[in-house]
Amino acid sequence: MAAIGDYGAKAVWPAGFQIYQRGAAADGVFIVLEGHVVLRNKIKVGRGFVPVIATSGQTFGSEGLSSGARYATDANASEETTTLFLSGQQFRAFVRERAAQTIPLLSQIMSERAFLLEKLHELAALNVDQRLISTLSHLSSDRTFTTPDGRLKLENNHHRLLCEMVGATRESIALALSRLVSAGIAERKGMTFLIQPNSLANTLGDYTTGEVGIPVAREMTIT
């Protein structure tokens, strides 16, 4: 972790810890080294919207790179999570002193911004079934949600997160998952759903009607 690690501060957050709150003064940028950080906006009591889950190699809190910015979401560690934090001052020093090595970090931030713009497009243009398939496709790239044979595994405790990522009620998600089972895309075992990622990619391709498929923000390798 040489280059960026020389400038940032490493921290380990326990599961459920709130790293920052929406509306708080923002500074710098965080990089996830291990674990997951859920970015969530509260809509009402017991409900929220999750635009993205930051995983290993991804950034969050980059609002802090703008002058006078405030955080746009809450950020919570969903499990024990290790992050690297660069304050605005440390980030500027990194850019000034290691200009060539800042390109991967800036590319990562831009990739994640593009993903959020695509997420807005989904909310405006796709129905619940389509948004669910896109979300499942995104989750299938995270080994936390997959079985050893590569299938996506959704358990009962994942349903709230799905609701918040898709932007739909629990009832709508349950119906959409049932339709995936009927279509042969998902297999149900009790309260658990098993899905082959390739079937999601094929179905998502059908929904895009010839347009470019929805991209997943790529992960930056820190060396």
Predicted regions mapped to residue ranges:
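Cyclic-nucleotide recognition modules
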Residues: 1, 52-114, 118
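Short aromatic/basic micro-patch
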Residues: 29, 53, 85, 156, ...
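Phosphate-/nucleic-acid-contacting segments
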Residues: 139-223
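Cyclic nucleotide-binding regulatory domains
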Residues: 17-80
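Residues that scaffold the ATP/ADP-binding catalytic core of kinase and kinase-like folds
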Residues: 40, 62-63, 93-94, 135, ...
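Polybasic "coupling" helices that flank or enter modular domains
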Residues: 78, 96-167
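Short proline/glycine- and basic residue-enriched helix-capping loop/turn segments at helix->loop/beta transitions
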Residues: 1-15, 70
